[in-house]
Amino acid sequence: MKDGFLGIDLSTQQIKAVIIDQNGKVVHTTAINFSTHEKLKKFGTENGVHKNGSVITSPVIMWIEAIDILFNDLRENGWTDKLRGISGCAQQHGTVYWKNGAENSLKGLDESRSLAEQLEMCFSVQKSPIWMDSSTEKQCQELETFVGGDQEMAKLTGSRAHHRFSAAQIKKIVDEKQDVWKDTEKVSLISSFFASLLIGKYALIELTDGSGMNLMNIKTENWHKPLFDFISSDLESKLGTLVHPMTSTGHVHSYWTRRFGIPSDCTVLPFLGDNPSSLAGLSLLPTDIGISLGTSDTVFFFTPTFEPNIDAHVFSHFAPNSGYMAMVCFKNGSLTRERARNLNNSSWDKWDKIMKKTPAGNDNYIGFFFDEDEIVPRKPKGDYTFECSEEELKNKHPEKFARAVFESQCLFKLLYTQKMGFKKSDCSRILVTGGASRNTVLLQILSDVFEMPVCTIDVDGSAALGGAMRSRYVHSKTTKTYSQYYPCDNVSLACQPISANVEVYSNLFKTFKSRFDEFIKQ
């Protein structure tokens, strides 16, 4: 391989790397799990996080140690000296708080010592609030009141105020921990925090992740300064300016060259949020829907115009002159599916046998299943069933419970895709990524519910892949647009809708919507 381009995804449960060559072919993938890796077990996380009621965090130093481990692995396997570009992404919305003087430590990194050794004391907040946190209801209400309500916040920033969004999380620290705030020199998103490590100075926040903070004017793509002043008079100086996601942030710091052998002219692009990076990795066409099936489930698609919706999000697009990315995020994804599997004492490779015990439509057994407080709809955790009690469904009919979970998740995705205004065409497809994209039963239900073919990408991890693809694109200096350069040819057809099931789900969807409308009013 002559030239390599590295994409990295710092997600909730793991850090994942994908390397592509000069032709765009995936040549290497690797992943490190935060909770199960021998060197990271000491942090005591469960699925990468610490939970204390509605407060959900991850240790910053755990991420840094994982990055150390990842790059040691890449060096030992002979990949680092071939890298020409690096980019990537991180779980969206989470914030990292650098102590006063921390940038000096970044600039002076010593190649004889690990990152963790040198940066452990550089953070005023040791455990970063992440996207799963729901402890900021008070701050959300105050922010929305300030701008004139949830609809006005959505018109201004692309989303109503959400618990996990950075504005509410920052305001909570300003309100409750003034001493910590005074000791904070810089606030990074997790994405710009990662880029900062690579370039040896504070990296700027880029537009796609910046649009997921409730602080950026989505139309002008500039910070909304009245919101800054409402939170804290010094917030603007601690966040810095915004940068376009396809603009180079410079080359790797000499630390990475001397310690890991990365060429000194290796370019670093801004790191995105994981969902916009998945959009880049999937190379979606305007007629496609992207669905990421992970700890959380997300549905996203390209939209040429800005249409605010309090139930969804609109983010800036990573590519110039490409409109917006519409998205809805469901907090309860893979962990709820795993609960259904465990209730049936099954493994995923035998899951189709469990699902075949019940028919499509589940004899009209419907439920809403939230292991954590849900984002959309904004409802507390719990199992909400209608045709029979939750306990009866789980104890007497675990197979019906399992199908109810899977079908409910798919029906929610259809409901909110319609709310976001997606227009289906004859050539529309669903492109699925994430850990559950290998679950053929789930993919078939999605296909039947949406009445669309479902495709998967050839490599697991579209978010990391998106970082590598963007890096290669910028390095090429091509005059083609991103979609021209990457014509979405790295996908495989997984399943087609089954006409008999389509009819069943069309009828079930009407009942589902009725149950949903009643549920929302409660």
Curated annotation (Swiss-Prot):
Protein's GO biological process: D-xylose metabolic process; xylulose metabolic process
EC number: 2.7.1.-
Domain of life: Eukaryota
Protein name: Uncharacterized sugar kinase R08D7.7
The protein's enzyme class: transferase
SUPFAM superfamilies registered for this protein in UniProt: Actin-like ATPase domain
GO molecular function, one term: D-xylulokinase activity
UniProt-listed Gene3D superfamilies: 3.30.420.40
Organism: Caenorhabditis elegans
Keywords for the protein's UniProt record, in alphabetical order: Kinase, Transferase
Entry annotated with the keyword 4Fe-4S: no
Protein family: Belongs to the FGGY kinase family.
Cellular component, GO, one term: cytosol
